[in-house]
């Protein structure tokens, strides 16, 4: 309990907060993770669906899989952990601090919950990107895959980062800078195994940030964390960010 109280105190006093989230934060919303016992990669080989080579071989197969995932994402709703991060952002910004949320997730749930200062490191399932002109555009509620670019009419691909691809331009630089400058870093629901995102916690620690991890299982980041909460994202965020009397009176974090 002493470590938890210390973490809460540090968070209340923090001026520069950086947060990294992974698949574990969206699991309570019904979005499957990738690497646990029930994860997507247990039933689907990533080399068959999530590489440029797989798309070049069989774009229809890849799009059919993504259309299924997109439907799952549209059916999902943000959960209390997503909303807790929206509230954390509000608190930090209201006292003149800086806040950046970096997510490895492509489900768009952080944006739907209301997060403003957000970097979607691996893209967004609800967008497509033209293979010819590069235009990004939101996918309509109903579409027949593959979609076509509204600007030039060329076929579009999912606007996500596949294995072997570079991150979106500027995304990594913004994320790295936020974690290097943070005085409080929070890592929620990630195995801390996928680079380069896995290095963000280490960057923050090396720069002197107070580091908190929320994950049911230990990760490579655990030995560095000042506090590791061995629990799910919803429970962990509730422990770390209990509502203040003012928030309860105003209806925040309800």
UniProtKB/Swiss-Prot annotation:
Write out the residues that bind Zn(2+).
130, 133, 149, 152
GO annotation, cellular component aspect = cytoplasm
Source domain of life is Bacteria
Q: Which reaction does it catalyse?
A: N(6)-acetyl-L-lysyl-[protein] + NAD(+) + H2O = 2''-O-acetyl-ADP-D-ribose + nicotinamide + L-lysyl-[protein]; N(6)-succinyl-L-lysyl-[protein] + NAD(+) + H2O = 2''-O-succinyl-ADP-D-ribose + nicotinamide + L-lysyl-[protein]
Binding residue positions for substrate: 66, 69
Pfam families documented for this protein:
SIR2
Q: Where does NAD(+) bind?
A: 22-41, 104-107, 189-191, 215-217, 233
Gene3D superfamilies per the UniProt record, alphabetical = SIR2/SIRT2 'Small Domain, TPP-binding domain
Q: How is the cofactor bound?
A: Binds 1 zinc ion per subunit.
Pinpoint the Deacetylase sirtuin-type domain residues. 1-250
Keywords (A to Z) from UniProt = Cytoplasm, Metal-binding, NAD, Transferase, Zinc
Obligatory cofactor(s): Zn(2+)
Q: Where does the UniProt annotation locate this protein?
A: Cytoplasm
InterPro entries membership: DHS-like_NAD/FAD-binding_dom, NAD-dep_sirtuin_deacylases, Sirtuin, Sirtuin_cat_small_dom_sf, Sirtuin_class_III, Ssirtuin_cat_dom
- Indicate the residues that form the catalytic site: 122 (proton acceptor)
The EC number(s) this enzyme carries: 2.3.1.286
**A GO molecular function held by the record:** zinc ion binding
SUPFAM superfamilies in UniProt: DHS-like NAD/FAD-binding domain (SSF52467)
Q: Which family does it belong to?
A: Belongs to the sirtuin family. Class III subfamily.
Return the domain comment text from this UniProt entry: 2 residues (Tyr-66 and Arg-69) present in a large hydrophobic pocket are probably involved in substrate specificity. They are important for desuccinylation activity, but dispensable for deacetylation activity.
Q: What does this protein do?
A: NAD-dependent lysine deacetylase and desuccinylase that specifically removes acetyl and succinyl groups on target proteins. Modulates the activities of several proteins which are inactive in their acylated form.
What is the name of this protein?
A: NAD-dependent protein deacylase
Which species is this record about?
Answer: Thermus thermophilus (strain ATCC BAA-163 / DSM 7039 / HB27)
